[in-house]
Design a protein with these regions (language model features):
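Phosphate-group recognition and catalysis centered on beta-loop-alpha active-site segments
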Residues: 18-295
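Bacterial Sec-dependent N-terminal signal peptides
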Residues: 1-25
Length: 295
């Protein structure tokens, strides 16, 4: 009876313990999954990142015409690595015809990703895959980890938006945020879904309406200081994620003194990865998660 009561108490406490579980000591982030070796922002890229040692999956999302959340980097299909449903090329002049916010997901799904050679990443494995829904990607990753007895991963979601493309490439920040929160709550990810953006507006909406969501500010702007950016943002995010070339010991010390973590992007060179980790970075975003085992 005593052991049964103990078990019941442990089970009762589990949700609270899980909800407040600490973040990883070092974020090993697979950029767009494993962009260096697999078609980016696809389910195979996410699975490969986990196999290669990533504890966090980074990806980009957009909202479709019918209100779905799709995983893809640009606001429209990139002809460099995507082809039409029949396998024919997408001409650069046609990109305006394939803006996700102006397409239903059923019309997006048949486009083919990964079949053609991608000159930026010649090591990418060629295959035929597609742009998944965020919900489908999460389900696939969670099922893979459960099947292979792997630890749960974190999801680092980037909101792709800009004030100048509101209404054309994405909804207003308030609507965008609500679509993401629907998926987050449905999938019960809790603290494992982290959200970052270069656009301050959706971060401000999230901070105001969903203060428990862990947020990160992305930057690659060397002409605007950290202090100016934080003043514009209006609050201290949990993460300040700059381009790796902007990271200094002074920046790291300041961020840490304010309780912010720094996870720079996008680092390919192993020596740069070692240098940033030794300097005190809280993680690294890379196209090559397999290189984490050399740190």
């Amino acid at each position: 009876m005593k052991s049964l009561l103990t078990l019941m108490m442990v089970v009762a406490l589990l949700p609270a313990v899980m909800a407040t579980a600490p973040l990883p000591a070092f974020f090993k982030v697979g950029h767009r999954g494993t962009r260096g070796l697999m078609p980016e922002n696809t389910i195979p890229a996410m699975i490969r990142a986990i196999e290669d040692g990533a504890n966090t999956l980074e990806f980009d999302v957009h909202i479709t015409k019918d209100g779905k959340v799709v995983v893809y980097h640009d606001a429209s299909f990139d002809p460099a690595y995507t082809t039409k449903p029949d396998g024919s090329e997408i001409q650069p002049s046609e990109r305006g015809n394939y803006i996700f916010y102006q397409m239903n997901y059923n019309d997006i799904r048949p486009f083919r990703i990964g079949e053609k050679p991608y000159s930026k990443f010649p090591q990418q494995q060629r295959m035929r895959t597609y742009a998944p829904l965020l919900s489908e990607m999460i389900d696939s990753v969670e099922a893979y980890n459960k099947m292979h007895h792997k630890a749960p991963v974190y999801y680092l979601l980037e909101i792709k938006s800009s004030e100048k493309t509101d209404g054309k490439e994405q909804p207003a920040p308030e609507e965008y945020v609500e679509k993401l929160m629907e998926v987050k709550q449905l999938k019960k990810l809790g603290h494992r879904l982290l959200i970052q953006s270069f656009d301050m507006r959706p971060l401000q909406v999230l901070h105001q309406k969903y203060p428990k969501v862990i947020l990160g500010f992305l930057t690659g702007d060397k002409n605007v200081s950290l202090y100016q950016q934080l003043e514009g943002l209006g609050f201290l995010p949990k993460f300040y994620n700059p381009h790796f070339s902007l990271v200094t010991k002074e920046l790291l010390d300041y961020c840490h003194s304010k309780g912010m973590k720094v996870v720079p992007w996008t680092v390919a060179d192993i020596e740069d990865m070692k240098r940033l980790k030794a300097m005190g970075a809280d993680g690294i975003i890379t196209d090559y998660p397999d290189r984490f085992n050399k740190l």
